[in-house]
Amino acid sequence: HLPPPADPSVLVHGDYRMGNLLVDDGRLTAVLDWELAHRGDFHEDLAYGCMTVWRFGRPDLPAFGLGSLEAFFAAYRAAGGRAIDPARFRFWLVYRTLWWAMGCLGMGAAWRSGADRSLERVVVARRTAEQELDLLLLLGDEAPEAERLRPLPLPQPPALSIQGEPSAAELVTAVREWLASDIKPGAQGRDKFMVAVAMNALGIAARALERPIDYADKLLADALLSGKRTLAEPGLLARLRRNALDKLAGDMPKYPALAIARSEWGASE
């Protein structure tokens, strides 16, 4: 799927998305964070800002969370840009979604190595689940219709019991609720933000204890990368979809694309 090198190549920002744009009175005034800048294909910047994760709560508006792709492409060309090649745009949309998933994993690796032991790094590392779901939404069309329509397996039942002594998940939930009721209201500035990050981390941990999920499968990953197994294999897409839904429901249950995927795939929670 790799397209030919861009000819001519142009300056690519590398992190061109709404979070790095300054706008005043309806006009773009600055673009921030140029540390990923390089020469390459202009489609890369256009696709990156259209990733679901950067639409900030508006997954229904595929162009930066602001509008339709058709209007975006037309405005880009009218402003002096080139015509958009849909195949190149799609390649970069898939590629940069995978790239960001690897970036999230890299943050977890940085935390483990001691290079950056900040709480934010280890929590952002769990956002890999968002990109796993987005990739399945992007790539599902490559599967045969019968596989796209195949019902999903049932979700894994919770392991939590409401009898006996409090479970580990309930202990974690109790700490999270204490932070919310006793600590967060009095926190100021960055401390208030970090309390929210800590609560998010505890929520992830509690849900993981309630529904233990370990879908790491290196043999399957290697087989998919080599092409030995594909989405045409009966039941594989349904299995991957269920795994992605369950993982994301535990890690980032408020991610907007989760509800979209459940609806499109006919999945129960």
Residue map of PLM features:
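An alpha-helical support segment within catalytic cores of ATP-dependent transferases
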Residues: 1-14, 25, 78-81
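Activation of the activation-loop gatekeeper triad in protein kinase-fold domains
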Residues: 32-37
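Active-site activation/catalytic loop segments of kinase-like enzymes and analogous catalytic loops
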Residues: 44-81, 95-115, 130-138
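All-alpha amphipathic helical-bundle segments outside canonical DNA-binding/catalytic cores
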Residues: 83-95
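Generic structural concept
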Residues: 95-98, 102, 176, 199-202, ...
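Long, amphipathic alpha-helical stalk/connector segments used for oligomerization, subunit docking
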Residues: 136-162, 171-180
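C-terminal amphipathic alpha-helical interaction region
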Residues: 162-178, 182-196, 207-269
